[in-house]
Amino acid sequence: MLNRTILVGRLTRDPELRTTQSGVNVASFTLAVNRTFTNAQGEREADFINIIVFKKQAENVNKYLSKGSLAGVDGRLQTRNYENKEGQRVYVTEVVADSIQFLEPKNSNDTQQDLYQQQVQQTRGQSQYSNNKPVKDNPFANANGPIELNDDDLPF
C-alpha cells in the first residue's frame, strides 16, 4: 500500500502554531494548489488543502512561512473524524506533512514588489530606445530573399 502526497502551492493564511497536551508543537495551514487544467471559462482553478506538521518542522513553518509563501509539502493523506457540539459526525481530510520545503525566502513577495517598483520608476518617462545602449547590427538586414544554409553549417 502507498499513501504519499506531494504538493506545491501558496499558503492562504499564516500558519497557526499550537501545543498538544503532551507538549508536541503542531502547525496547521491551508495550501492553495493550482490545477493543471482550465475550466470552461479558461480560468485555472485551485484546490485548498489543509496541512498539519509536527515538532521542530512546525516551529520552522511558523517562523519562516506566512500568507502567500510558496512551499512544497511531502506527506501522507489522512482522514479523521469527531463529533461536534451538535452531535454530528464531522470528517476532516488533511495532509500530514513529513517534509516541507520553503521555496522562496521569507518576505520575498515584498522584495519582488520593491524591485518591480524600482524598475518602473527608473524607466518612467524613458522610451525603450533611449537607454543609451548601442543597437546591435542585424547581420541579415541586407539579405534579399531566402538565406541558403547547408546542413554541414549547423552545429547540431
From Swiss-Prot:
GO CC terms of this entry: nucleoid
Keywords, ordered alphabetically: DNA damage, DNA recombination, DNA repair, DNA replication, DNA-binding
Keyword Cytoplasm applies: no
BP terms from Gene Ontology: DNA recombination; DNA repair; DNA replication
Source species: Staphylococcus aureus (strain MRSA252)
Residue ranges, annotated region (Disordered): 104-156
Ranges for domain SSB: 1-104
Superkingdom in the source lineage: Bacteria
Cross-referenced InterPro entries: NA-bd_OB-fold, Primosome_PriB/ssb, ssDNA-bd
Residue ranges annotated as motif Important for interaction with partner proteins: 151-156
Alphabetized PANTHER family for the sequence: SINGLE-STRANDED DNA-BINDING PROTEIN
UniProt keyword Ribosomal protein, yes or no: no
Subunit description: Homotetramer.
Composition-biased stretches (Low complexity): 112-128
Name of the protein: Single-stranded DNA-binding protein
GO MF entries: single-stranded DNA binding
Summary of the function given for this chain in its UniProt record: Plays an important role in DNA replication, recombination and repair. Binds to ssDNA and to an array of partner proteins to recruit them to their sites of action during DNA metabolism.
